[in-house]
Amino acid sequence: MNKQSNPLRVGIGGPVGSGKTALCEALSKRMRDRYEMAVITNDIYTREDMEILLRADALPPERLMGVETGGCPHTAIREDASINLEAVARMTADFPELDLILIESGGDNLASTFSPELSDLTIYVIDVAGGEKVPRKGGPGITRAALLIINKIDLAPYVGANLEIMARDARKMRGERPFVFTNLHTGEGVDQVIDFIVKQGLLDEVRSQHHHA
């Protein structure tokens, strides 16, 4: 990874209901003791995702910020990311020691991506309930995200989705880029996601610079 912002900014995208908020919660709870973290959520008209994270005690309330994007959630992370860049700047000013900010996009479709000025590493979350064809449908989230997460693998038998076919299609669409199968309710696969963020985002280097500065 060439571009390194301080703190590391990880964009989390994916369709409504795929598990973006559940991922933010799981990452926060497993990483908060080791890294200084904050989360910014994007919702169309409410701050519902931020409220979910608050109720789950994912992070202290002052480290959670909800951005209301209005009618076009993808615009707020892509064409005009200023509302999110402003939120990042405020969080960084409030917590200068931050190592990591997770930015959860509003419910979007397969075509939305994060602006490179907003996100250093992008994770795209889809779920098995969408059907095994989702990886092969492609779209920038599936083909270009640094990491693809295929969530809710426990539902595969109920929706007739074959995980081997999904894995094969994900490899075909993504080439060398990695993907992970997860069940965010049980925590299965979360360690692989954390490992990816730490290594690809050079998080331990960021942390040692911060804490020895």
Curated annotation (Swiss-Prot):
Q: Which GO biological process annotations does it have? A: urea catabolic process
**What PANTHER family does the record point to?**
UREASE ACCESSORY PROTEIN G
**Which GO MF terms are attached to this record?**
GTP binding; GTPase activity; nickel cation binding
Localization per Swiss-Prot or TrEMBL: Cytoplasm
Q: What is this protein called?
A: Urease accessory protein UreG
Q: Which UniProt keywords apply?
A: Chaperone, Cytoplasm, GTP-binding, Nickel insertion, Nucleotide-binding
Q: Which residues form the signal peptide?
A: none
